[in-house]
Each structure stands twice: as C-alpha cells, then as structure tokens.
C-alpha cells in the first residue's frame, strides 16, 4: 500500500493496534485516485479497523471488507471482525454499513468486485484490489470443491486448503473472462500474488520454511502478471522483486505522482515488464517476523530476520545460503563469503535503525471493544456487552501443567 517496508509505516504485528498503518503515509490508492482512477477494495484490509485507519480514509472510493486479519477473528484492542462471522454468509462492511451476505466469502468478494468494475466501464479507469480471506485458516471450502481431494485421501485440513485455492482459481478465471466480455482485457493489467508462503504443511517447492518464517519458503510468493498485447505470455522474470515495488510500478504506468518518493523502498518494475533480461541493479531486501512483546522492539532486532539479494540469503547473523546452488538452504557458506555477510549485516542494521523511529504503535493503548463489533451492535440496535478483560499470558516457565 505504501511502497515501504511494513516496519517503516508502523506495522510490526498483526494485532494489538500494531497492525495499523501510521497516519499520514501516502498510499497507492491515493496516488492512483489523484491520477484519475477510481479505486475499490474487496476483502481483507488489515491495516487498521478504526475510522482514521480504514481504507475509505486511505484512498479507496469503494470499500467492501471484513475486519481484522481474517473473517471471524477477534483480538484485544480494535482489531476484530463482525461478531459471529463465518466463511459462509458473512456480514461485510460496505462503505461503512454492514451487509449480511449469502454464499462463500471468496465468491462474494469476486462478485462484488466484478459488479463494481462493470459499473465503471466507460467511465474512469479503475484500480480493483481483491484480497480474499481464503486460503487463510481455518481451512474451510464449499463442499463442491472438496470431493476430489477427499477422494484422493487427503486430510481434512488439506482438503479445505486445496479446495479454497481451487475456488480462488475459478474466480480468477471468471474475472479474466469477464474482462474479455467487457472488451477491456487489453487495457487491463491483472496481477495475482500472495502475501506469504503457505501455512499448511503441503508442498512448498522444496523451500525451507513456511508462513511466519523468514526463510525462502515463508517469503517467496507467486507473482503472475497478465496484460494481453503488452506483456508477452509465458515470460519468466528471474529478477528478485518485492510487494513494495508495486507502487512505483503503478506510478510509472498510470503517470501518477507518488509523494515522499525519497522514502520509498520499492522500484518500478516497468523495465522488466518490457524486457525480462533488462539490466537491474542488485539490492538487499530485509525480512523480519516481527510480533515481539510489548516494549521489545530494540531487543528483538536479531530475533528472526533475513537479508536477501539476487543470489544469497542471510538468515540471522551467521548463516548464509547460496540460493542458486542451494535453494533448499542446507549448506551454510558464510565462511566462504565473510565480506558479503558483513555487508548484509551492516545493511540490515542500517535498515533496522531507520525502522525504529517509525514504529509508532508500540505503546498504543488497547481499545475496550473491537471497532467492527461496536459498529455492528450500533447498526443493529444491539446491547453493548461489558468489556471482557483479557489477562496476559504467564511466561511459559511459570505456567501450571494440566
């Protein structure tokens, strides 16, 4: 959303008010709206549920979202979805009013997005951000998407996981067909990507790690780009890129003017879109798992980080992998490349030093009720229950055995 690394916009956790993107940060939809686009989000936001942080205040004209990081989630503080929500028939916040929907969540988000896109046809160009809750756990899919995986003898969680993915695949297919039927597919860049590696214990390309890990398996994601007549089908680009390269890329395509350009971490990918082998200056990209305890930002500097360039991945201070020769991360080659490891560690420290003053949510007080709960209760004239006090968990060594 910002063209910057999460820590640099205040996001160091997924809950506890630390999921909020700090106010005043220019966003991608704001830039596109200023460039003449209309903007819509359909699905997951997860950058703050309170009013000043919600997407209608961050550049989106059309907003159709669930709360928190997943449908039905609820945590201490403002982060939470509408009470009682499930993957089927969820209550969705549509331009600050809840709508009780019917169907499976992914189908609902795509249907709403396509209805909105159809209404924009012949008007302004549009930016549609479709962020599905699936395949987030719990792994629940429509029955029609589970049968073949059940017949294959898979476990119930794997059945749900793959069923959710196949449902997404079908919805993307519906979207591409609709763009063609509207006659705008040649004018539309369609991007499919995910936000992290898989959380389920399934095939991961022989990469080490999964969601929550700073290893390749936790951070490497698919990135498929489709633009008939502009991008050559079947082209593989092997150059490393990041999610925060999207904002400067969209700025170049849409002739937008990103504000605070000197603070962007991303780089326009347009040269690689034109030529997969275009010259490209190597760079260090930093990953950190975050999610430390309250007040522990500084001492968590070395707790779960990695630095990546085109060929090598430094994991922690003393482990270096050659990702070209060893994509499964089995052989530590730091003794063979001490100077490179030194540079990567120095780059990381510089990055973390710059991130610390931007971690503005570390001491934010927790609200009494989830924001979406309060909005839901008010809209439906429901009584607001007393605040449930969540006691802090005891340190592991002090927990009583059951």
Roles of regions detected by a PLM:
Residues 365-371:
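Long, compositionally biased
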Residues 353:
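Acidic/polar, glycine-enriched structural segments that form the non-catalytic walls/loops
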Residues 318, 363-364:
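Acidic carboxylate-rich catalytic motifs and surrounding loops in phosphoryl-/glycosyl-chemistry enzymes
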Residues 1-316, 323-346, 350, 359-360, ...:
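Formylglycine-dependent sulfatase
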